[in-house]
């Protein structure tokens, strides 16, 4: 049975599993594996669409992939990212969230930022939209943070992240993602918040963990961040299978009699 926002609000201290999925087959596999929540992240821009960052991802693209993921995982709680600038104002955020929830079938939306987006979060929650916050490394604005690197090393950075997480909770977010922050900071934030935290590159002390599907299964062999654990080398196995197929076609081995009518 699909979890509800209330379940996640009461999930503090539980070891929850989030996983990204961007289409019907990956969402179907994630649901079959029993994950607690699927995140249709704007990371799809990089791992599915080949963009250099998440910035070019549009609302229409997010909607397209959210619909597909929902069809693949009808019984799993599904969170969809609000893409870059889709929540620059509350009106824009409400329109984007409306489409992702009503048309896309998402159960909640995620947006990046701390204190600076707290009022947007408050307005969304007031309108009945469940919101997952996101602090630390925020990929949509990574260039302002010096690139894709660890955040919160310096005391002032750590304070900003903690204050941001607390502001998101106070605004009504049902949980907060902590990305690429020191484990000790993630532990402190997790202990200070009453809502659950979701870590990615944030150590073992968060309430939940999230990883990108393609990283977990090793679809891209040349990309492995330090915080990723690969459970399969799918990219290599798939490439080997496709090479064998091509070879057998060229050699006249496939199709054989057993593949013919």
From Swiss-Prot:
A GO biological process held by the record: pantothenate biosynthetic process
Highest taxon in the source lineage: Bacteria
Cofactor note: Binds 1 Mg(2+) ion per subunit.
Compartments, as annotated in UniProt: Cytoplasm
Active site, UniProt feature: 179
Cofactor(s) it depends on: Mg(2+)
Gene3D superfamilies in the record: Phosphoenolpyruvate-binding domains (3.20.20.60)
Binding-site residues, 3-methyl-2-oxobutanoate: 42-43, 81, 110
Record HAMAP family: PanB
Subunit structure: Homodecamer; pentamer of dimers.
Protein's name according to its UniProt entry: 3-methyl-2-oxobutanoate hydroxymethyltransferase
Organism whose genome encodes this protein: Thermus thermophilus (strain ATCC BAA-163 / DSM 7039 / HB27)
Gene assigned in the entry: panB
């Amino acid at each position: 049975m699909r979890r509800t926002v209330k379940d996640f609000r009461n999930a503090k201290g539980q070891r929850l599993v989030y996983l990204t999925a961007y289409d019907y087959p990956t969402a179907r596999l994630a649901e079959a594996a029993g994950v607690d929540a699927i995140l249709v992240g704007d990371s799809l821009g990089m791992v599915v669409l080949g963009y250099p960052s998440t910035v070019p991802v549009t609302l229409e693209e997010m909607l397209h992939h959210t619909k597909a993921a929902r069809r693949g995982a009808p019984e799993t709680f599904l969170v969809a990212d609000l893409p870059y600038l889709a929540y620059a104002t509350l009106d824009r955020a409400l329109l984007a969230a409306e489409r992702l929830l009503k048309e896309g079938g998402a159960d909640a939306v995620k947006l990046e930022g701390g204190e600076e987006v707290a009022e947007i979060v408050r307005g969304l929650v007031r309108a009945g939209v469940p919101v997952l916050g996101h602090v630390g490394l925020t990929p949509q604005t990574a260039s302002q943070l010096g690139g894709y690197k660890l955040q919160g090393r310096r005391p002032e950075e750590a304070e900003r992240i903690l204050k941001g997480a607390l502001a998101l909770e106070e605004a009504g977010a049902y949980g907060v993602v902590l990305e690429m922050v020191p484990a000790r900071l993630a532990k402190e934030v997790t202990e200070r918040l009453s809502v659950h935290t979701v870590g990615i590159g944030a150590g073992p002390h968060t309430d939940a963990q999230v990883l990108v599907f393609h990283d977990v299964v090793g679809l891209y062999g040349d990309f492995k961040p330090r915080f990723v654990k690969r459970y399969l080398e799918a990219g290599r196995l798939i490439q080997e299978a496709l090479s064998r197929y091509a070879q057998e076609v060229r050699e006249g081995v496939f199709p054989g009699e057993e593949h013919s009518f």
